[in-house]
């Protein structure tokens, strides 16, 4: 028995369980949340991470999130400069996409503690615009911040290709919670986001890329060609890349 392999798999399962319980995803309809100050970076509650999606049916955290080299990103950028349309489309699939996270509590579910909400570019820009507005300012302030209404509409409900998330920052100022002990617990008992997403080494990501490019299959060439054609077709259909990534990331 390969004990190291067993330990690695156990760690993967524990990481997945830990992530699930510490992430929040809006459900269809309206919910109210509060964005909290982030314990591990009190100057900025928003955490920008980059991910490779859909490689070998998995999502991988890119080291470029932390300013470190990433072989998949390097390969994607080389493909972009090849002048070949199919390789350019493959590069778009391979390159890392940004997803922003913020620590939040959900109104009515405060007992569940702090969770991380991950959202796309549109929601991120709206939140930054509100905070930059002097009439609103720091919406995360423990005493005079503001709650945020989040509305999630499924693709079926909207008749669009992708689900839609919209936000409205409430005008009334209010504390995160009234109880001081509960407030302290919410501000101090926060995970570091890097505990939820495992960063693979340069060598491990190289193996991921090689597996994606050269799947262990008798029909390797046919499968790779099909993947490239699929990427081209999908890219032609996608008008809102951010919305598309939101849908894929949340599956």
Where is each model-derived feature located?
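Short acidic, low-complexity intrinsically disordered linear motifs used
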Residues: 74, 233-251
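Short low-polarity hydrophobic stretches
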Residues: 70, 147-148, 245
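OB-fold ssDNA-binding interfaces and closely related basic DNA-contact patches used
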Residues: 1-135, 203
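Compact mixed alphabeta submodule
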Residues: 107-229
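Intrinsic-disorder/low-complexity linker and hinge segments
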Residues: 14-21, 217-240
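Alpha-helix initiation and N-capping motif
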Residues: 3, 180, 202, 238-242
